[in-house]
Curated annotation (Swiss-Prot):
Protein name per its UniProtKB record: Sodium/hydrogen exchanger 8
Cell compartment(s), UniProt: Golgi apparatus membrane; Golgi apparatus, trans-Golgi network membrane; Endosome, Multivesicular body membrane; Apical cell membrane
Chain ranges passing through the membrane: 54-74, 78-98, 117-137, 150-170, 185-205, 255-275, 305-325, 348-368, 373-393, 411-431, 445-465
Lineage summary: Eukaryota, Metazoa, Chordata, Craniata, Vertebrata
GO biological process, one term: potassium ion transmembrane transport
Gene: Slc9a8
Length: 575
């Protein structure tokens, strides 16, 4: 009845407009849009909610077990074992136990233990990438920015072309399974993402050359973003079905797409970071740390969503945003928010990394595999060869322009430290290859390569460093049991806040410029950019910051000392 009345009213209104205006063309109002309804309703929605709840429970359970494992590694000083290796091994063990439980038909957690690529790229990867940029040692990074960029951009592209081209031509020769050119390049791009978590932990423990440490660490940070952009480029070419386009046109379009993604995303992230610095410089939120911290969290995730929304790389944008916010915005924060931001990012990044490595181990039993021994062996050979073609020629080229030369021993360690990690694994699951057997072959091969590099190469890095005698003299005098490979323990002990310094910004700037022979961007940054984007701290600001920290610490300490009966230990004070 209501529908008939609505239709009658609609038609009469059209007729009224028609007669009133005296036009010859009938005026028709647009049909009302259909209401937006939930995708799942009723019993189906309830089942979806239950499934999501079990997935969350299972993920948190895995994380809790991994945290206990890391705690045991720290407590019993098993510092020779990197946390990533231990977590992957635990994931493999848990996957085997779940497989036995499913075989005995005691429970079915098949859906919960499956890794979802969208969850990785939307929830897990952004905090990891942002934290790596935010905690970056800016001095060593910018002093070696040319070398790092060459290895991360051109080196990754070389490795991707070597692996992708090798797979394509071996397939054409019927040595391994055939893949077309774009699929081969996509696999070469995703498998070129290095993640030397275990190697960096060993470098820090043995105090190797800081230049070597920064070259490997800096390359790995930019390399992740470059690898994702290259993989997206190959996928974009696949979606366009460019089989009738010449090779040169394909290459030129791929290059244009890559340059747009790389520089556009980097510019967006840099601009967002600079805007955040200006906002928090001119809007003083230091007296309300909760609002200040909330604004930082918003600006941290903002470039990722914007970049993905305009078809750029969110990972590249959030990386550069993290670097810029750490360099400028961080110094506009109150001391409480500075420390809170560092510890929160480290905690969230640790949880995300642990979750990814655990599910990487679980995937051995949960992922539908297609194993081809010749394909796996040739891919491992090509990965190692592509890394060598990347590192050694570029290192020799850079030595013509560097004062601090990259020695052959350092080149060898850089080649050996090309571990693969979570990003190749997630990218392999994200590829939309057809048929399904091809996707399973790529996924299985990627998992094997990742485990091979983490367990074998990562586990043998410390003996190799001792063998080639590249460690610092202090570390050489230590016994093996004193070497600490715990990233969690090291990062938990690091607290940085310039508010705890005794120098004002002007005094520190004058002292820094006087002590350092700054050139190029470093001089420009210290002279003009840093004063423009950061708040100038006076002695009064420093004094107020120290008082605030002491007051809050005493307050927290008193609350911690509060006994169950409500009594306090007033005799002891922290300060």
């Amino acid at each position: 009845m209501a529908e008939e009345f609505s239709n009658t009213t609609h038609e009469s209104f059209n007729f009224t407009l028609h007669t009133t205006l005296g036009v010859t063309t009938k005026l028709v109002l647009p049909t009302p849009a259909e209401p937006i309804l939930p995708v799942q309703t009723g019993e189906q929605a309830q089942q979806e909610e239950q499934s999501s709840g079990m997935t969350i429970f299972f993920s948190l359970l895995v994380l809790a077990i991994c945290i206990i494992l890391v705690h045991l590694l720290i407590r019993y000083r098993l510092h020779f074992l990197p946390e990533s290796v231990a977590v992957v091994s635990l994931g493999i063990l848990m996957g085997a136990v779940i497989k036995v439980i499913e075989f005995k038909k005691l429970a079915n957690w098949k859906e919960e233990e499956m890794f979802r690529p969208n969850m990785f790229f939307l929830l897990l990867l952004p905090p990891i990438i942002f934290e790596s940029g935010y905690s970056l040692h800016k001095g060593n990074f910018f002093q070696n920015i040319g070398s790092i960029t060459l290895f991360a951009v051109f080196g990754t592209a070389i490795s991707a072309f070597v692996v992708g081209g090798g797979i394509y031509f071996l397939g054409q020769a019927d040595v391994i399974s055939k893949l077309n050119m774009t699929d081969s390049f996509a696999f070469g791009s995703l498998i070129s993402a290095v993640d030397p978590v275990a190697t960096i932990a060993i470098f820090n423990a043995l105090h190797v050359d800081p230049v070597l440490n920064m070259l490997v660490f800096g390359e790995s940070i930019l390399n992740d973003a470059v690898s994702i952009v290259l993989t997206n480029t190959a996928e974009g070419l696949t979606r366009k079905h460019m089989s009738d386009v010449s090779g040169w046109q394909t290459f030129s379009q791929a290059l244009g797409y890559f340059l747009k993604m790389f520089f556009g995303s980097a510019a967006l992230g840099t601009l967002t970071g600079l805007i955040s610095a200006l906002v928090l410089k001119h809007i003083d939120l230091r007296k309300t740390p909760s609002l200040e911290f909330g604004m930082m969290i918003i600006f941290a995730y903002l470039p990722y969503g914007l970049a993905e929304g305009i078809s750029l790389s969110g990972i590249m944008a959030i990386l550069f945003s993290g670097i810029v916010m750490s360099h400028y915005t961080h110094h506009n924060l109150s001391p409480v928010t500075q420390i809170l931001m560092q510890q929160t990012l480290r905690t969230v990044a640790f949880l995300c990394e642990t979750c990814v490595f655990a599910f990487l181990g679980l995937s051995i039993f949960s992922f539908p595999h297609k194993f081809e021994i010749s394909f796996v062996i040739w891919c491992i050979v090509l990965v190692l060869f592509g890394r060598a073609v990347n590192i050694f020629p570029l290192s020799y080229l850079l030595n013509f322009f560097r004062d601090h030369k990259i020695t052959p021993k350092m080149m060898f360690i850089m080649w050996f430290s090309g571990l693969r990690g979570a990003i190749p694994y997630a990218l392999s699951l994200h590829l939309g290859l057809e048929p399904m057997e091809k996707r399973q072959l790529i996924g299985t091969t990627t998992i094997i390569i990742v485990l091979f590099t983490i367990l074998l190469l990562g586990g043998s890095t410390m003996p190799l460093i001792r063998l080639v005698d590249i460690e610092d003299a202090r570390a050489r005098r230590r016994s093996k049991k004193d070497v600490n490979l715990s990233k969690t323990e090291k990062m938990g002990n690091a607290i940085e806040s310039e508010h705890l310094s005794e120098l004002t910004e002007e005094e520190y700037e004058a002292h820094y410029i006087r002590q350092q022979d700054l050139k190029g961007f470093m001089w420009l940054d210290a002279k003009y950019l840093n004063p423009f984007f950061t708040r100038r701290l006076t002695q009064e600001d420093l004094h107020h910051g120290r008082i605030q920290m002491k007051s809050l610490t005493n307050k927290w300490y008193e609350e911690v000392r509060q006994g169950p009966s409500g009594s306090e230990d007033d005799e002891q004070e922290l300060f």
